[in-house]
Amino acid sequence: MIYYLDTSALVKRYYEEQGSAWVHSLFQLENVLMVSKVAYAELLAALARKRREKELTEVNFTRAAESFQQEWKEFVVAEVTEAVFADLLALVKRHPLRGFDAIHLCTALWFRKRLKADILFVCADRNLCATAETEGFGVHNPEQQ
């Protein structure tokens, strides 16, 4: 199966919270996991914020960040390019999206168009899930099992 993970879903792989078990299961199967290059910065920043807010110890932060960096090569990563952003203006005209949400959805649309395949959009943000559904994606929110 092919999955696109936005950062709200991806973080559940490296920080235990509601929906983490489901996200972990994606890594145990022979799935294709797609992400945007921006997820790299977003994920590390999210882990650092959890460290600052004392939700992660320094040791656990380092462990999570290193694990993420090691697994990064397992993802199919879309670079942030003009080709990926070709439909960005039309997308934000149709939907009230925040900047990085627009990048993630635009990237998933680019993957779908390029592969001509169904992609399950995985996201823990209800608004982005609803928008992705409107754009024709199958959607899974790991927090709503």
Which residues are covered by each model-predicted region?
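Acidic catalytic patch
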Residues: A39-Y40, Q70-H95, A102-T107
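Helix-adjacent hinge/juxtasegments
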Residues: R49-E82
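Acidic, PIN/NYN-like endoribonuclease modules and their adjacent C-terminal/linker elements
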Residues: I2, C106, W110-Q145
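Alpha-helical elements of the RecA-like P-loop NTPase motor core of helicases
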Residues: A21, A86, C129-A130
